[in-house]
From Swiss-Prot:
Pfam families noted in UniProt: Lys (PF00062)
Gene Ontology cellular-component terms listed: extracellular region
One Gene Ontology term from the biological process aspect of the record: killing of cells of another organism
Name of the molecule in the record: Lysozyme C I
Additional free-text comment from the UniProt record: Lysozyme C is capable of both hydrolysis and transglycosylation; it also shows a slight esterase activity. It acts rapidly on both peptide-substituted and unsubstituted peptidoglycan, and slowly on chitin oligosaccharides.
Record organism: Tachyglossus aculeatus aculeatus (Southeast Australian short-beaked echidna)
SUPFAM superfamilies (alphabetical): Lysozyme-like
Molecular function per GO: lysozyme activity
Gene3D superfamilies to which the protein is assigned, alphabetical: 1.10.530.10
Length: 125
């Protein structure tokens, strides 16, 4: 499912992500846009054999279990397939854990290259 920006915003607010670790909503929205184009079913395979899943491209090496990534930590204690359904609540809970451990959005390559320090006005909720 391709989410509309407003749907994503509503979900982010509901999960208490506005201001979490000092991260503003436009930063979350920008990250989701550049990671997946707001597509809840997005997957991308990495050269290390891991896969990124869902609207925020959560990685199977560390955060979710897909049954095929060697040495997966599954720190969010979730099946990666749950990150591909239309309900993004679990994606956001896991993303919150990731951002909490990193104290920000640095684990997301798209945020570092396309959102950090950029004009985020088009990603306002």
């Amino acid at each position: 499912k391709i989410l509309k920006k407003q749907e994503l915003c509503k979900n982010l607010v509901a999960q208490g992500m506005n201001g979490y670790q000092h991260i503003t909503l436009p930063n979350w929205v920008c990250t989701a846009f550049h990671e997946s184009s707001y597509n809840t079913r997005a997957t991308n395979h990495n050269t290390d054999g891991s896969t990124d899943y869902g609207i925020l491209q959560i990685n199977s090496r560390y955060w979710c279990h897909d049954g095929k990534t060697p040495g997966s930590k599954n720190a969010c204690n979730i099946s990666c397939s749950k990150l591909l359904d239309d309900d993004i609540t679990d994606d956001l809970k896991c993303a919150k854990k990731i951002a909490g451990e990193a104290k920000g959005l640095t684990p997301w390559v798209a945020w570092k290259s396309k959102c950090r320090g950029h004009d985020l006005s088009k990603f306002k909720c």
